[in-house]
């Protein structure tokens, strides 16, 4: 587990990158926040030691992209209908 200083530094340094990647892939603020928390939780619990800042940044990018893809492939995501689509449909009798 990482120290609070390491986590705060990583959040300060990579939060913008993680959020932007999420928004590009998910186009949804709520899902972006969920993945953001997931990525940084993985970082906190990870015991990976990084060779350099570039290696650490690459880890954040890869973990973020993978988490976004996992969410997009998930059963829950594939079985939901956005509310705005339901509002546009005529009522079924």
Language model features with spans:
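Arg/Lys-rich amphipathic alpha helix in sigma70-family domain 2
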Residues: 65-83
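Sigma70-family region 2
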Residues: 27, 38-55, 75
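Residues within helix-turn-helix
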Residues: 30
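Short acidic/histidine-centered micro-motifs embedded in hydrophobic/aromatic stretches
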Residues: 38-39, 84-86
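Acidic, proline/glycine-rich intrinsically disordered inter-domain spacer in sigma factors
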Residues: 86-93
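Conserved catalytic core of Hanks-type protein kinase domains
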Residues: 13, 25, 62-63, 71
């Amino acid at each position: 587990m990482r120290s609070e200083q390491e986590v705060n530094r990583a959040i300060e340094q990579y939060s913008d990158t993680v959020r932007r990647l999420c928004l590009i892939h998910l186009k949804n603020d709520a899902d972006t926040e969920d993945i953001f928390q997931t990525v940084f939780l993985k970082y906190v619990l990870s015991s990976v030691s990084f060779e350099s800042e570039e290696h650490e940044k690459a880890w954040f990018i890869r973990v973020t992209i993978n988490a976004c893809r996992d969410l997009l492939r998930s059963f829950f995501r594939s079985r939901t209908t956005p509310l705005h689509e339901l509002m546009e449909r005529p009522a079924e009798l």
